[in-house]
C-alpha cells in the first residue's frame, strides 16, 4: 500500500541492454557509428592542437598486419636451400646447458711492471733516440755567453736572476729553449706555405723535469724581445719626429695652416707587450718577483694581477698611464677583463702558458683558448711550458697546433737520482695503521738526526732550521694533520685555499726564500744582547734544560699542504718532503717530489704506505723513475 492508501503493484524488472536498444532505435545512427558498442556510441573527435609524440623519432616501425604473418605451411615450396654462411654464435646460457665451455681469452702475460705503472701511460713518452740527440746538442753550450742576448740582459742573469752563484751555467732546458726562442723566423715555418686557417704565430712547447729552470728559459727570451722592440720603437719614433719637424718647416715656408688638430699617439696603458698565464695566485706572485728582480737593471715595466689583490690595485697596475710591458695573471681574471676592455690583448706579441697541463685541461681550456684567439692578431710567439705532458695535452696540441716546436730535455718525466725515496709501512709496529703517528715519528727522527751539528760552530749563532713539506690528498685533512703535529710538539702550519691571503704569503715565504746569512753587525748585536742576559754569571752560557726538548722539537718547521704547493713553487731551500698519502696519479707523484732536487741540490722524500695504498706503484716508481740519469 502506498502513501495514498492504495495498493501498489510490484515493479517490473527492466533489462538495461533492452533499454539501450530502444534508445538507439529512437535515434538512428549514420555510417560507422551504427556498428559501435554502447561504450563508444559517439565517435570521439581528435583534438587539433594535440602535439604528436613521434616528431623526435627518426623512423617509426610499421605495424605488422595479418597479411604479413606466416601461415600454417610456410617455406614448403623452396627450390634453394637457405643455409646461413656464418653460424650463429650460441649464447652463454645455451653453452652452459649443453655442457660446453666458452673459449676464454688468454690471460694477460704482461709483466708486473706494466700492471703497477698503468697510470704512467697518461704521460707522453720520449723515445731513447730523441733523448740521445738532445744530450748531444745541449753539450755544445757551456755558458750564457753562447746566446745572442743583449748585453744588459746577459749581465742581469748573474746579478739578479742567479745572485751568489759564481759559476752559473745554463740548465739543459735553457740550452735547448733559449736559442730557439731568440730566433725570429725558424726555417721550418719559412718553407711552408701559410694557410688562412692556420695560426700566423710561432708555437713552442717547453717540457722539462721539475726544478730545471723552465721559468728563466722563457723569461730571458721574452725580456730580450721586449727590449729589442723598445729599441726599434724608439728609432721609429725618432724618425717620425724628424718627419713632423720637416713638415712643420715646409708649412711655415708655404704659409699653410693645419685645419685639423694632430691626433695624439695611442696610450700604452692597459696594453702589455707580453702576458704570462699561470694557474694559481701563488705562481703569479713568484713569477712576478722574478720579473721585478730583472726590472731593476733591464728597466722595463711589469705587473701582476690575481684574485688576492684588491680591484683598485689591479686597475692601477694594469692601466698605469706609464704603460706596462709584461703582465702576469691567471686566465679567468684576464679573460674577464678582456670582455670589458678588448684592447688589453691588442698589443701582445708573446703569450706564455706556464703549467700548460693545468691550463689546457677541462677546467681551463675554454678560457685559455679564448685568450689565445683574442691575442692572435698581434701575437708572434705562443709558448707552452710544463713539467709533465699527459697524453690528453699531447693530443690536444697536435690537433690545435700540428707544427708546434717541441723543446724537451732527456730527463723529462723522471725523478733524478739525487732525490732519495724512502717508504714507511704504517701497518707495522709501532704505528699499527695510525698514519698521524707515523708522520710525527718520521718528522721527529729527521729533526733529531742532525741535531748539534749547527750549534757547534758558534755559541752565538742560532741552529739552522730544517723545513719539511707534508702533502695530503684532501684539503680538510691539512688542518687536522697540522693540529695533530702541534700536539706532538712540532711547529706545523697548514697551507690550503681556506687560509688567508696574508697568512699564505707569510707561511710560503719561509719555505721558498732561503735564510739570509747574518751580517757581522747582526752577529755582534746578538752577542751583546746575550751578554746582557748573562751579566750576573759572566763567561758561563745558560744550560739548556730537557723540559722543553721533551715536549717540543726545536729547529724544525713543517708545512702541511695539498697540491696547491706542488706546482711551480720554487722551494729551493727545501730538502725533505713527506707524502702523507700515496698520490692519485703519476703526474701528482712527479710534481710533489719535484719540490726536491731543484737546481742540482739533494733531497729526500718519505712515502707513508697503508693497507689500502698501492704499494706496488711505489715500488716500481723507485725502480723505474730513479733509474734514469740525473
From Swiss-Prot:
Report the domain remarks: The Q motif is unique to and characteristic of the DEAD box family of RNA helicases and controls ATP binding and hydrolysis.
Q: What class of enzyme is it?
A: hydrolase
Binding residue positions for ATP: 208-215
**Domain of life, per the record?**
Eukaryota
Protein name from the UniProt record: ATP-dependent RNA helicase mrh4, mitochondrial
Q: Which InterPro entries match?
A: DEAD/DEAH_box_helicase_dom (IPR011545), Helicase_ATP-bd (IPR014001), Helicase_C-like (IPR001650), P-loop_NTPase (IPR027417)
Q: Indicate the segments forming the Helicase ATP-binding domain, all copies.
A: 195-407
* Annotated gene: mrh4
GO terms (molecular function) for this protein are:
ATP binding; ATP hydrolysis activity; RNA binding; RNA helicase activity
Q: Does the keyword Mitochondrion apply?
A: yes
Q: What is its EC number?
A: 3.6.4.13
What reaction gets catalysed by this protein? ATP + H2O = ADP + phosphate + H(+)
The Helicase C-terminal domain sits at: 452-630
Amino acid at each position: 500500500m502506498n502513501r495514498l492508501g492504495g495498493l501498489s503493484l510490484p515493479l517490473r524488472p527492466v533489462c538495461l541492454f533492452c533499454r539501450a536498444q530502444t534508445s538507439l532505435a529512437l535515434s538512428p545512427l549514420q555510417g560507422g557509428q551504427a556498428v559501435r558498442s554502447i561504450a563508444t556510441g559517439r565517435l570521439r573527435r581528435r583534438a587539433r592542437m594535440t602535439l604528436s609524440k613521434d616528431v623526435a623519432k627518426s623512423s617509426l616501425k610499421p605495424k605488422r598486419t595479418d597479411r604479413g604473418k606466416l601461415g600454417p605451411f610456410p617455406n614448403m615450396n623452396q627450390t634453394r636451400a637457405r643455409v646461413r654462411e656464418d653460424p650463429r654464435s650460441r649464447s652463454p646460457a645455451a653453452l652452459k646447458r649443453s655442457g660446453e665451455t666458452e673459449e676464454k681469452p688468454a690471460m694477460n702475460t704482461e709483466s708486473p711492471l706494466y700492471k703497477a705503472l698503468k697510470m704512467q701511460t697518461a704521460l707522453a713518452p720520449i723515445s731513447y733516440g730523441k733523448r740521445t740527440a738532445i744530450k748531444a746538442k745541449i753539450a755544445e753550450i757551456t755558458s750564457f755567453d753562447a746566446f745572442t742576448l743583449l748585453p744588459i740582459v746577459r749581465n742581469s742573469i748573474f746579478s739578479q736572476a742567479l745572485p751568489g752563484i759564481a759559476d752559473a751555467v745554463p740548465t739543459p732546458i735553457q740550452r735547448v729553449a733559449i736559442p730557439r726562442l731568440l730566433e725570429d723566423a725558424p726555417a721550418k715555418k719559412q718553407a711552408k706555405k701559410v694557410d688562412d686557417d692556420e695560426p700566423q704565430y710561432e708555437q713552442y712547447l717547453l717540457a722539462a723535469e721539475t726544478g730545471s729552470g723552465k721559468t728563466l728559459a722563457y723569461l730571458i727570451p721574452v725580456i730580450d724581445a721586449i727590449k729589442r722592440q723598445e729599441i726599434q720603437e724608439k728609432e721609429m719614433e725618432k724618425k717620425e719626429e724628424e718627419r713632423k719637424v720637416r713638415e712643420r718647416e715646409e708649412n711655415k715656408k708655404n704659409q699653410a695652416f693645419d685645419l685639423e688638430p694632430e691626433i695624439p699617439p695611442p696610450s700604452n696603458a692597459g696594453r702589455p707587450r707580453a702576458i704570462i698565464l699561470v694557474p694559481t695566485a701563488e705562481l703569479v706572485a713568484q713569477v712576478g718577483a722574478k720579473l721585478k728582480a730583472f726590472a731593476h737593471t733591464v728597466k722595463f715595466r711589469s705587473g701582476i694581477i690575481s684574485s688576492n689583490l684588491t680591484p683598485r690595485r689591479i686597475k692601477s697596475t694594469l692601466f698605469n698611464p706609464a704603460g706596462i710591458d709584461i703582465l702576469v695573471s691567471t686566465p679567468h681574471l684576464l679573460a674577464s677583463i678582456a670582455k670589458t676592455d678588448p684592447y688589453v690583448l691588442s698589443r701582445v706579441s708573446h703569450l706564455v702558458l706556464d703549467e700548460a697541463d693545468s691550463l689546457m685541461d677541462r677546467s681551463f681550456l675554454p678560457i685559455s683558448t679564448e685568450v689565445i684567439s683574442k691575442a692572435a692578431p698581434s701575437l708572434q710567439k705562443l709558448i707552452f711550458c710544463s713539467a709533465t705532458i699527459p697524453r690528453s695535452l699531447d693530443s690536444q696540441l697536435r690537433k690545435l697546433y700540428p707544427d708546434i716546436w717541441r723543446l724537451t730535455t732527456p730527463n723529462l718525466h723522471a725523478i733524478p737520482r739525487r732525490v732519495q725515496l724512502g717508504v714507511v709501512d704504517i701497518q707495522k709496529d709501532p704505528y699499527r695503521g695510525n698514519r698521524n703517528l707515523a708522520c710525527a715519528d718520521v718528522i721527529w727522527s729527521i729533526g733529531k738526526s742532525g741535531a748539534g751539528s749547527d750549534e757547534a760552530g758558534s755559541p752565538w749563532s742560532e741552529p739552522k732550521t730544517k723545513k719539511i713539506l707534508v702533502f695530503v690528498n684532501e684539503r680538510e685533512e691539512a688542518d687536522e694533520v697540522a693540529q695533530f703535529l702541534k700536539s706532538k710538539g712540532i711547529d706545523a702550519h697548514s697551507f690550503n685555499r681556506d687560509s688567508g691571503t696574508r697568512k699564505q704569503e707569510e707561511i710560503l715565504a719561509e719555505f721558498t726564500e732561503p735564510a739570509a746569512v747574518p751580517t757581522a753587525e747582526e752577529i755582534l748585536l746578538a752577542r751583546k744582547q746575550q751578554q746582557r742576559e748573562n751579566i750576573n754569571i759572566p763567561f758561563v752560557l745558560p744550560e739548556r734544560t730537557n723540559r722543553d726538548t721533551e715536549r717540543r722539537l726545536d729547529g724544525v718547521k713543517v708545512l702541511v699542504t695539498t697540491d696547491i704547493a706542488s706546482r711551480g713553487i720554487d722551494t729551493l731551500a727545501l730538502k725533505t718532503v713527506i707524502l702523507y698519502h700515496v698520490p692519485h696519479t703519476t703526474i701528482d707523484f712527479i710534481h710533489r717530489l719535484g719540490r726536491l732536487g731543484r737546481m742540482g741540490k739533494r733531497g729526500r722524500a718519505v712515502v707513508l704506505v697503508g693497507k689500502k695504498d698501492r704499494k706496488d706503484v711505489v715500488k716500481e716508481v723507485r725502480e723505474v723513475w730513479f733509474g734514469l740519469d740525473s
